[in-house]
Amino acid sequence: MKKKLLIGAALILSVGTACTSGAGDWQSYSGDKRIEERVDSVLALMTLEEKIGQMTQYSAKSDIVTGPQVNTDIEPLLKKGYIGSLFHATSSAAIRKTQETALAESRLKIPVLFAFDVIHGFKTIFPIPLAESCAWDAELAERSASIAAAEASAVGVNWTFAPMVDISRDARWGRVMEGSGEDPYLGSLLSAARVRGFQGEKPEDLMRLDKMLACAKHFCAYGAAEAGRDYNTTDVSERSLRDIYFPPFKAAKDAGVATFMTAFNEISGVPCTSSKFLYQDVLRDEWRFNGFVVTDYTAINELVPHGVARDEAHAAE
C-alpha cells in the first residue's frame, strides 16, 4: 500500500518547519530564521527519485488492514531515501529501528514520518467521535485528543489521520461513527477542538513531545455519498458545499491543522482527489492553506477506474 503525498511532508517537517496560514511564508516551530534557505538547500541536493520518494507513503508490516494491500520490501527504499512516511507503524522498537536506518543509511538523512489512525484514543480508548459529540462539549473532545496525542507520540507516531470532520446525514453510511454527525456548527466546534488537542494551541506546540500532526479528512462531502454507499458519488451543489460540508474543514484550518486528506468520492463528476476546485481554488487560494495534502488509501490509483486517468502512472501525474 502507498499513499502519495501531494507535497513532500517528510522533507518539510524534517527540517523543523510548519506552514503558516498565510500565503507563501514558512515558519519554523523551533524559531529557525533561515528555514526557507535550509529547505531550498536540501531540495537542490535531491534527485527526482528522492523527491518522488519523499512524497510517497508505504504501509508498515501490520496485522491492521484498512484497504488493498501492496506487499513491499521497504528497507531498500528506506536506505535510498525513497520513503517519506509509513502508515500503521505502532511499535516503538520498530519505529526506532526504521528511523535509525533512515538517518544512518540514506543519503540526505531525512527522517521518516510515522502515521496512524488515532481516531478515539491510542492506548486509552475513548467513546467514538459520534458518541463524544453527543456531549456537546468541545473541551472534552480537546482533552481526549490531547491524551491520545501524548500516548501515540510516546511510541514515535507523529501524525494522525484525524479528525474526520465529514458532515453525515444518512445513517446508512458506514462511517457515520467517525464524525460528529449532521450539524455543521457542532461539527466545526469539535473539529477545531480536536485539532487543538492533537497539535496544541499554537504552531510551536508541535515541537512538544506530546503533540502530533492532525489531518482534516475527507475533503470533501465524503459523508454525502448517495444511498449511504461508501465510495459512491455525491450530488451536492456548491452552495451545499459551502453551507454544510466546508465549515468543519475551514474550522480545522483556522485552528491550524497541519494536513488535509482527499476524499474518495466525486463531486459533479470530478473525483475529489483530482479536483482543482477543492485543492487549488478553495484550499490554497481562498483559504490560504499552506500545509500539505495526503491522498486517502490508494485514492490516486482509483483515478483509473474513475475514468480520469488512463493508467496509474498517468494518475500520479
Predicted region positions:
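Glycoside hydrolase catalytic-domain context in secreted enzymes
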Residues: 19-317
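Bacterial Sec-dependent N-terminal signal peptides
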Residues: 1-28
